[in-house]
Amino acid sequence: MKKILVAFDGTVFSEGALEYAFHLSQNGSAMITGVFIEDLSYVGYATLFGEDYFTFNSTLLEKMEHEDDRKLSESTEKFEQICRERGVAYEVHLDKGVPVNELVRESLFADLIIIGYRTFFSNVMGEASFLKDMLIDAQCPVMAVPDHFEPIESLLLSFDGKPPSVYAIKQFTQLFAELPAKLPVTLLSITKTKEETLEYEQLMREYLTVHYLHISYETFAGEAEDAILNVAEQLKNPLIIMGAFGRNAVSRFFSRSAASKLLKNQSLPIFVSHR
C-alpha cells in the first residue's frame, strides 16, 4: 500500500484518523494525503450555525466562510506539523464541494481512505448518512475509525461464502501484507440458519493459512451486524473487516438500529471494501 487518504472537514480535525494512518502506513513507507474539504452545501452551513435554511442570507454566508477559512488553515497546519514530526511523506489536498462527491473522486486515485466517525457528521442527513454513502460509493477501501486511537491488536474477518466476501478479505490481506504475520485473526462465518453451510469455506480457510499465522474460527447464525458486534466484544482492540458485504448489504447494515449501535460505541474501527 502506497497512498492513504485521511479525510478532514472544516470543523473537525480527527487526530484518531491520522494516528490510524501512521499505524497502518507500513513503517512509514506510504504517502499520507490529508484531504481537507470545505463543505459548500448550504444545508450543511445552515445546520452548523443553527440557522433555518430558508432564512439563509449573504451576511451569514460571509461569516461562515471566514470562520471555515480560519479552521481550515489551523487544521492543515496541524496536519503538516504532525507529519513532519513523524518523518512521514505527506501531501495536502484542499477541496471545495459536497464532501461525499469530493472523496469519491479522490478515492479513484488512492489505496485506502480513513475517516473518523465524527467527520462530516454535523449535517441534517444524520450520523450514518455520510459514512454509509462513502462505504457504498468509494472506489477504494474505506476505514472508519474512532476519535481515540488504540493500536490494532486483532483482526475480525467476516465471511458469508460468497465471492464478494472473498474479494474483500483478499484485498485487505494484500493491502496490509505485514499485519497478518503479527496479529491474531478470527474468521467469522455468518449463516442465516444453523443448518446452513457456506460455499467455499474450506477454500477460504486454506487461503488464510497461507497468509495468517494465528487463526481462530467462529460461526454465527443470524443477522450480520449482531454477529460482528457480538464477536468483536470478545476480542482485544479488533479491526473489523466487513468482507461479507456488497453494496446493498452495506446499506442494510446502516439501518437506524445497526448504525446507532456502532456509532454510539464509536470504539470499533471497520474496514469495508466492495467490487
Task: Please provide the spans of the model-predicted regions.
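Ordered, amphipathic secondary-structure segments that act as subunit-interaction surfaces
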Residues: 71-78, 82-88
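Small/aliphatic-rich secondary-structure junction motif
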Residues: 1-58, 137, 150-219, 234-237
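Gly/Ser-rich helix-loop-strand patches that form or flank binding pockets
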Residues: 14, 92, 100-149, 232-275
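CheY-like receiver
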Residues: 24, 82, 102-106, 227, ...
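A short acidic, glycine-rich active-site loop
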Residues: 55-73
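Charged docking surfaces used in two-component/phosphorelay signaling
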Residues: 94-101, 220-225
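A short helix-to-beta-strand connector/capping loop
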Residues: 83-91, 211-216
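N-terminal membrane-insertion helices
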Residues: 68, 72-76, 197, 201
